[in-house]
């Protein structure tokens, strides 16, 4: 601000502008070149730290302030009014500190007023320098680096802990396996300790193997010998065994002589025997009722060979057959044989005889003597023997078997084998062996 000149002073009425600058800035406020003011910038050869002068050698720029004092521009503090000076003397003699002397007659600011400039206050109100910001950024960067390093250390420590756990688990499993293996060895070694301590040499081992091989060869030779002996015995006894088998088959466990065999002289009286069953369709007859492709004669009942279909069939469920015995026989039993239902091709035994009667016949007068009535049960054994009612015993040259019914077949009845048991008498005793009339 402009200040009025003091009375009696020859100061110019020019406008004064104070030159304030910061230590961080090399530029200062300059005066107006149009008014002939001197620039506040340091001249050539002038030190940089030289303080700026006012526009004239008069007073520094002041502003109206509180009464009784003056206020420096740019400062909020109130300063007392300076003491009066001889401006000419001061301007002629005073020089700026650290600079060249001014020409005579130009006002120069003394050091004492310069000390009164509010330089310190201006510096305190300046914004913080950029160095502080750089320091903060460096501090934050350092903290971030430290945090990243700490995180890496923690991750590495976690990995180490995991690897240590894995190693501990592996070592535990390995120790358990070794313990089990050791216990197994102890269990196996303990029986071996009870064996003889002496170990066999290789030659002794070969000798034992050789001796055992010889023993095996001897056993094989004995087995071959026994096999040959058994074969010889079988060959020698084959005929005997066959005879025994056929004998048992012929006897059929009856163990009684059979006088109704064609091989001992028995025959069929065809005149007194029923007619054979004649079927027009022999193929149907064979396939359905398991017969041969032709009708069997009644002599088949005198043969020892009994198998399904090898029988004598007569028409209907009633018929008779008369057997001529090889001599006079005191009859005691009659045996009938019929295959069981399980082996019949027709799946049943309904053609078997059921109720029948036995008669003894004399040769001369053809007198019939009843020897009893009986029933053949197909559910029982296939061979059934019936005891005759011949008391007192009488000898007969013929015997008649009369079939009264069968087991349900509507067209025919089959008779397989008939046996006559008793005692054969001599010709001299023929007259005394007469049965009742």
From Swiss-Prot:
This is Sperm-associated antigen 4 protein. Involved in spermatogenesis. Required for sperm head formation but not required to establish and maintain general polarity of the sperm head. Required for anchoring and organization of the manchette. Required for targeting of SUN3 and probably SYNE1 through a probable SUN1:SYNE3 LINC complex to the nuclear envelope and involved in accurate posterior sperm head localization of the complex. May anchor SUN3 the nuclear envelope. Involved in maintenance of the nuclear envelope integrity. May assist the organization and assembly of outer dense fibers (ODFs), a specific structure of the sperm tail. Residues 197-244 form a coiled coil. Predominantly epressed in testis. Expressed in ejaculated spermatozoa (at protein level). Homodimer. Interacts with ODF1. May associate with microtubules. Interacts with SUN3 and SYNE1; suggesting the formation of a spermatogenesis-specific LINC complex; a SUN domain-based heterotrimer with SUN3 may associate with SYNE1. Interacts with SEPT12 and LMNB1; during spermatogenesis. GO terms for molecular function: protein-membrane adaptor activity; structural molecule activity. It is a multi-pass membrane protein. Keywords: Cell projection, Cilium, Coiled coil, Cytoplasm, Cytoskeleton, Differentiation, Flagellum, Membrane, Nucleus, Spermatogenesis, Transmembrane, Transmembrane helix. GO terms for cellular component: cytoplasm; cytoskeleton; meiotic nuclear membrane microtubule tethering complex; motile cilium; nuclear envelope; nuclear inner membrane. Residues 265-425 form the SUN domain. It comes from the Eukaryota. Residues 19-31, 72-88 have a biased composition (Polar residues). GO terms for biological process: cell differentiation; spermatogenesis. The keyword Nucleus applies. Residues 1-12 have a biased composition (Low complexity). Residues 1-88 are annotated as: Disordered. The chain crosses the membrane at residues 135-155, 166-186. It holds the Pfam family Sad1_UNC. It is found in: Membrane; Cytoplasm, Cytoskeleton; Cytoplasm, Cytoskeleton, Flagellum axoneme; Nucleus envelope.
